[in-house]
Amino acid sequence: MKSIPTQAQVVIIGGGVIGCSVAYHLTRLGWKDVVLLERKELTCGTTWHAAGLVGQLRATKNMTKLAQYTSELYATLEKETGQATGFKQNGSISVAPDSGRFEELKRGASMAKCFGLEVEVISPRETRELYPLLNIDDLVGAVFLPKDGQTNPIDVTQALAKGAKMGGAKIFENMCVCEIETKNSGTSCARQVSGVKVEVPSLGSGEASELKTISAEIVVNCAGLWGHQVGKMAGVNVPLHAAEHFYIVTENIGLPSTLPVLRDPSSWIYAKEDAGKMLVGCFEPKSKPRPLSTIPEDFSFGQFEEDWEHFEPAMLNAMHRIPKLEDAGIHTFFNGPESFTPDDRYILGEAPELKNFYVAAGLNSIGIQSAGGAGKVLSEWIVNGYPPVDLWDVDIRRFHSFQGNSRYLKERTEESLGLLYAMHWPFRQPETSRGVRKSVLHDRLEKTGACFGEMSGWERANWFAPQRTEARYEYSYARQNWFEASASEHQAAREKVALFDMSSFAKFVVQGRDAEKVLNRICANDVAVPSGKAVYTSWLNERGGIESDLTVTRLHENVFLVVTAGASQIRDLAWLHKNIPDEVHVTVTDVTSGYDVERDGTGIPKFTFKTHSGRFIK
């Protein structure tokens, strides 16, 4: 057994596809003092049983670019490392049985073209030409992406690991991290990571394992299913939860190796060719969350008990779409864990609670297609100190502490697993884990007919339903049911009076004799204004990019109120702390839950303020 080092520049926790990708990309950037620690064996958690689909189209341009890069990387890994990956680009087909789904697919196809992807909108007949096994009787149309593909998850992970070792990284298996060590950072961030404690198995049988410490400048949490638990060791919120994920593999039915991947999201199913067999999996609308406490500590290459009753509706859908499945024998019924986040987007970046502690976890069952791009940009973030592109979609700082609550996560995971194949309607609102944060005006707004949406846990009145009308969204890609109500509100705000409840906005009190000096250093605009004056400003980074867009109100000589978007509360608070010099006399207090913010229209003298001003009212 190789002896583990006592120090390293970077320690990566977790030997799944994302951990190996981070190690690989760090070495590509010239960092060789990289140590990866895996609790059991590489891929043994969730990577090994992944379906291995490598799609390229995501919801935004930057996420699509990362998925494209993953595909390009997998296409070259075997030549670079000599390790086979099983990667092939047979394309993928997504089918639509109704006009709403087809509209969504066509919108996605238009976006794909803007992002530089090859894509075709095809008829049902053209779909069956590409996929002869398909029942097209109820199809409206489909979208074909010819460069999508699939790979072998274990092989591609081993290729990344081999590439990392070729670049100088050291990989250790059967090394369980049991503690994250921290120290005072000497800045207003207060704490930074300093290393990890590892349980090193003894060489002799029956002997207890030995605890050893590896000092490290940077630690990366790539622990997958155990990412939430590892985050807790460090005092870092990593909101993810396990769920059971199901698929079957048929007996060999002679499928051609060139068959495209099939997705029928309205039926919750996907299918791919697997050595002449067919793998059929599902993302059902209501999943089965699996608390980590029910998963054995030594879980490795494991699976859960079968649940045919839960999988049966998806299987019936699959047999309708692919009639050949009715006569196919079942070789494998698989039920195993995957980890999911509250918004179905993965978690990436430096933790706001702990300097130099990075996270890449919660891949939401698309880890294989995400790992290449996510590993690349996180490595660049680590090396350069900032992300190479806008990664707000997946930034860990978008999450709030309440979202790490086990009850919240369990309830939300019932919904989040199915979001990948749900209809992505404009203004769609979460259905689970609601009512976490409410304004003091919530009850009165509700009685007035408010239809609430959710933003970072806050229940916000998005629009008001007319009397004797239910305050509920009716989703559509056409004009939705709230248009007329919103028009009436808009007219009232212009011609009469309106009071906007902005309690969900984040609020920080910055005070102390150096408060003005600190804020003037951080803000692009001048906050040296009289008391009661509000300043609209940006926070810029050293590259001239905008980090935040907010207002700063001077309440008293040495007291300022910063008001920013609720969604960026954690991000902006972390940025503020990060940029306060050590030697100044200033304190920052998050008063978001303690203060309400109201913004008035015109016409009521009691609430009439001069523009760019503010004061407390009772």
Question: What are the residue ranges of the model-derived segments?
Answer:
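Flavin (FAD/FMN) cofactor-binding and adjacent substrate-gating region
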Residues: 76, 88, 97-174, 178-184, ...
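Flavin-dependent oxidoreductases
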Residues: 21, 180-183, 192-203, 210-307, ...
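Glycine-rich FAD pyrophosphate-binding loop
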Residues: 27-47
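Glycine/proline-enriched, intrinsically flexible loops and inter-domain linkers
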Residues: 389, 396-618
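Beta1/beta-strand and adjacent pyrophosphate-binding region of the FAD-binding site
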Residues: 4-18, 35
